[in-house]
């Protein structure tokens, strides 16, 4: 596939998230997709997105920059939303937030097969002022994906 076609795959995935239509991801993300941060695959990513929708019903992603080289696509993304539902053990604050993310996806045969994403969660927590004042859960929170991984593994047991 061309570099532009690879970039289009990531753009379509972001559009699917913005439209809240995760079924569209099935055509864009390989069933054996592996996320290097979460150490799990496609279903965990969908669970994380659903959690975001619950915490931030107006959640929206905007691609600021997108670059492709070989089979990899890099994107700098800005996420916005209003915290009106529980998220990661934090009670709703009603605050509007905006945070940045950098994601790298490897694309093979028109599908994302591998991913790395770094979110600026410190900025997220600072804006929302949630870390010390609103967190219900007593579990340590090292990152949003680690938290989701913990919850997913508990459901399986």
Residue ranges and their predicted role:
Residues 1-157:
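C-terminal and inter-domain tail/linker signature
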